[in-house]
Amino acid sequence: SFIGLIAPNIARHLGFIKAKSELIASCVLGALLLCVTDSLAIFLAQWSLDMIPTGTATAGIGAPALIIIARKQMSAQDQLFFSMPKGPKFISPVAYFLLGTMIFGLLALSSLSQPSSDMGYFVIPDAFEWSIRWPRMLTAIFAGGGLAVAGVILQRLVYNPLASPDILGVSAGAVLALIFSSLFMGYSIHSLSPWVAFLGSAIALCLLLFLGKKHQFAPSILILTGISLTAVLEALVQFSLTRVGEGKYTLLAWLAGSTYRVEPESATIMAVVITACIGVALLLSRWVTLIAT
């Protein structure tokens, strides 16, 4: 997902420069972006023969956004040194009001979108429709917020506005660990996924920092190293998927990043865990500030 890249850059552009305010703003923006993208995937599915995964829709929006950010915020001298972009020093109350109105409006639009309804594109869902819709919305909101907070921490850790879990190989490490545990150890991809994914992402991050230590974590070198690490890990994932039979179709559907058929229990557990992690990040916001200095 590109949420970890886009949301922090938008937050800084709006003027949320301090670590704590940037974490909060990025969390809200990330939750909003992924929720709206999920609703867009539902809306576009009416012209498709199958459901459009939210991960696919996010990549389709995030890739052009990455190009725009790189063209507008980077210059020729950034080949040697990247710097965190600065936004306006003061944020007017009108900006807060407009941002809050936009968030409320888009969330309302997301919750009311029912493209398959005979009564129109946007209707108030009944109890049955809402029982299917709310786990998907909850998953998109908290997953987006968690990815955005992870993006803020990584960008401040390496002092690079283009750093995000998917670009630096952290997400690829989590995916590879899950694939290995599912294919070669017999575990279900849903049973131990949080712990296995955390272990894989932690190993990938440690490897990235180890490789970047020689060049004193130079932002440009670290980005290239992260892209290379991502390519290697994704190649291993593709190779692993070619070694199995029909079970790979379940894994491919999972890799697409769909929020379809998310169970209420899984969505609730994920929301609680991500809320706790975001709370810890806010409590340690001063450390995040010191990291970026």
Tell me what each language-model feature is.
Residues 1-293:
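Alpha-helical transmembrane segments in inner-membrane proteins
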